[in-house]
A protein has these predicted regions:
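Bacterial N-terminal signal peptides
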Residues: 8-20
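Short beta-strands and strand-coil junctions in structured, solvent-facing domains, enriched
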Residues: 68-73, 93, 198, 283-284, ...
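N-terminal secretory signal peptides that target proteins for export/translocation
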Residues: 1-5
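Non-catalytic beta-strand/loop surface segments
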Residues: 26-71, 100-183, 205, 217-270, ...
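A common structural junction motif
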Residues: 194-201, 293-301, 410-421
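Active-site recognition of the HExxH zinc-binding catalytic motif
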Residues: 77-85, 89
Length: 509
């Protein structure tokens, strides 16, 4: 949900700043935003949003590439996330002892891996031959490793005062970000353009092993991680939102440098990238620098939009995972994309129903009935660009079953359909929405992230401000209408984590 972006940006700011102190500055920002924000698009299609702000001589940026796990196809799931890892491995001039020799070693490594992969994927693999080829592949990998200067990209940024160097991959985007002193802007332009102009696939298979271990730790060894993955698979039977961002293990074990290069060639087109720059910069001074460095990226066609549309669901789906773990209960309801006119109403429902200790679910299930130790609502799973999921979830208290939690939760959902919310609940939602926006404007990093996200999702960064006005216009009747439309059994996917011991014959309930 779009309001989630406000909340995420708040985390990047000093939330403790008094609202009364921040509000005048925020109001001034909104009034003067268009005067201080420049949108500049290069000839190759790359768009930059530049917001000049007074204050510290620093700037923050966020680059959003319009590609995530939803753009992957079977066989290469996890490759968007994998390329994010590769983007920190340096450039032809940074992170290597001898780039030309290293490239020859990487080419030989790739050929060795593909030969090994063909052998082990044969219908009747020759075990001895497979092991011989694996040994040859590992030898090539060790040879390529001798040219690597570890952490060179990270060190180059931190050495010049950079902070917050990171990136993230979601179902629909890959985002890169950090902050630097303003007098290091040309360094930013060089590093960021260079790593996308000349991507290197340094330590690719070593990093692939890291990603596989990440999957093992976060999904395969975590019952709740497995539950959410199965939930997505059950809720989406056509749309690629069902694919995990980290990828399926069978794909991680087999995709190659060749696959990664092909993926980059299609999706890392300048027309598919937007960068927001916020802080102590002057657009007139930095645009020539942007042109000089980022203008080097060759123009490519913007990839075609995703065609697949999830068909309407006609029946409730229930999945149950049994493990030696705390029971966990999730209901997921399909909802429209974040650009739908009803999006602010979904935010209101989420706020009133399940956000925080004053929400209906928390008060009813946790405090009053003591059926759960946690109860909340969330949106935006696994993304917001396409129709996605609205979640209601609860963790049963000791001795309470998922069935008991389910019944109590559904009572609260149906109240949203059959009864008006109170004036106090609606007013609290609108007040918090404004407060979240105000706080999100205080930090350069959070604001850069919001600008680039709103611009790519809605086509206009101004939606960052107009959206709060749309939330202010939500009515009680709107909430009942949308709740009646979404909280239907046929629109529901249920995921249950049951304690295996409690289900076994003679097990305790």
């Amino acid at each position: 949900m779009l309001r989630t972006l406000y909340r995420l940006a708040v985390l990047a700011t000093t939330v403790g700043v008094g609202l009364a102190l921040v509000a005048p500055a925020a109001a001034q920002d909104m009034a003067s935003f268009e005067k201080r924000l420049t949108v500049h698009t290069l000839a190759n299609g790359y768009t930059f949003l530049i917001l000049e702000r007074d204050g510290a001589p620093t700037f923050s940026f966020a680059t959003r590439v319009d590609v995530g796990s939803a753009q992957e196809v079977p066989g290469i799931t996890g490759l968007a996330h994998m390329f994010e890892h590769m983007a920190f491995k340096g450039t032809p001039h940074l992170g290597t002892k001898d780039y030309q020799a290293e490239q020859r070693a990487i080419d030989a490594l790739e050929e060795a891996y593909r030969t090994y992969e063909r052998a082990r994927s044969a219908t009747t693999p020759d075990t001895a031959e497979v092991e011989r080829l694996r040994t040859a592949f590992k030898a090539r990998e060790a040879e390529a490793q001798t040219f690597v200067v570890p952490n060179a990209f990270d060190d180059a940024v931190s050495r010049e005062g950079g902070v917050g160097l990171n990136a993230s991959t979601s179902a629909e985007a890959t985002t890169y970000y950090y902050s630097l002193p303003s007098n290091k802007f040309e360094l930013f332009a060089y590093l960021e353009s260079e790593r996308f102009l000349h991507p290197v696939f340094r330590e690719f298979y070593k990093e692939r092993d890291v990603v596989m271990e990440e999957r093992r730790q976060r999904t395969e060894s975590q019952p709740i991680g497995r539950l959410f993955e199965r939930l997505l698979g059950a809720a989406f039977f056509a749309h690629p939102y069902k694919q995990p961002t980290v990828g399926y293990m069978s794909d991680l074990e087999r995709f190659t440098i060749t696959d990664a290069r092909a993926f980059y060639d299609v999706w890392y087109a300048p027309a598919n990238m937007v960068t927001a720059i916020v802080g102590g910069v002057k657009a007139s001074e930095i645009i020539p620098v942007i042109e000089r460095y980022f203008g080097r990226l060759p123009a490519k066609p913007k990839p075609a939009p995703l065609r697949t549309i999830e068909p309407p669901h006609i029946a409730e789906t229930v999945i149950t995972l049994r493990d030696q773990a705390q029971p966990f209960y999730i209901e997921a309801y399909h909802k429209p994309a974040a650009t739908h006119p009803d999006e602010p109403i979904y935010d209101a429902i989420a706020e009133i129903l399940g956000r925080g200790r004053t929400s209906r679910l928390y008060r009813s299930l946790v405090e009053e009935q003591k059926l759960a130790v946690q109860a909340q609502v969330g949106g935006g799973l696994p993304g917001v660009k396409y129709p996605h999921l609205f979640l209601a979830l609860a963790v049963p208290a000791r001795g309470v079953t998922n069935d008991q939690v389910r019944d109590a939760l559904r009572v609260e959902l149906q109240k949203m359909v059959g009864e008006d919310v109170t004036d106090a609940e609606l007013d609290r939602f609108k007040t918090r929405a404004k407060a979240d926006l105000i706080r999100s404007l205080t930090g350069d990093s959070g604001l850069a992230s919001q600008l680039v996200t709103y611009h790519t999702l809605t086509g206009d960064w101004r939606e960052l401000f107009t959206y709060v006005d749309r939330m202010a216009a939500v009515t009680k009747a709107d909430i009942r209408r949308v709740a009646a439309d979404v909280f239907k059994p046929s629109n529901r996917t249920v995921a249950r984590l049951e304690n295996e011991a409690a289900q076994a014959p003679g097990g305790t309930k």
